[in-house]
Amino acid sequence: MRDATLIAEKLLQVKAVQLNPTHPFTWASGWKSPIYCDNRKVLSFPYVRDYIKSELCNVIFEKYEAATLLAGVATAGIPWGAMAADQLKLPFIYVRPKPKEHGLGNQIEGDFQAGQKVLVVEDLVSTGKSSLQAVDALVEKGLDIIGMVSIFNYGFPVASEQFAQRGINYTSLTDYPTLIALAASTGLIDKEQLSLLEKWRENPSTWTI
């Protein structure tokens, strides 16, 4: 992993990640969470956006040089995948959660050929469910998945276990343990809040204050 702490610092700086241990957020899954990560906010800050784009491209160049195609996971993975593809001069496609119900009925948008070596681009990974749905759609079309990259990773065992079972080589620019450690060291949260944040990650589906 590159300088995960610096990436985490940038996310906190633009408030792409919000920590609120005493008034938790509710995720779409229904989980109560003391953290909310919205990397889409980074897109509004050109210098931070450019820095993260560069780090993403460095990781792709160093670890996934064999990639001949980048695939963004809709919707938040699309801008990062497109920017990286532009920088690296690679073709780009994106994957919807499910096929369109009108028009051509595509789930994958863009031009590709079976057998191409594709790298999946996510903005963040939590349980890994949406990531694996995208992988399944790509594999069904005959594409060769060489790995996956993201900006942020919650580090849930369920995701890492499923990626390992599928043989997916995964890299994230930063992660949850790095971010909360930085928040504690800079005084954004106190020791009690840090402990609460650590306990949440152990069992997020049943966590309560």
Residue ranges of each PLM-predicted region?
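Short, glycine/charge-rich flexible loops or terminal/linker lids adjacent to PRPP-binding catalytic cores
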Residues: 81-119, 127-133
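Phosphate/pyrophosphate-binding loops at sites that engage ATP/ADP/AMP, CoA/4′-phosphopantetheine
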Residues: 56-68, 135-141
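Short glycine-rich phosphate-binding loop at a beta-alpha junction
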Residues: 65-74, 149
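Active-site-facing substrate-recognition patch
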Residues: 1-63
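Conserved coil-to-alpha-helix start sites within the AMP-binding
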Residues: 76-78
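Conserved acidic residues
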Residues: 68, 116, 146
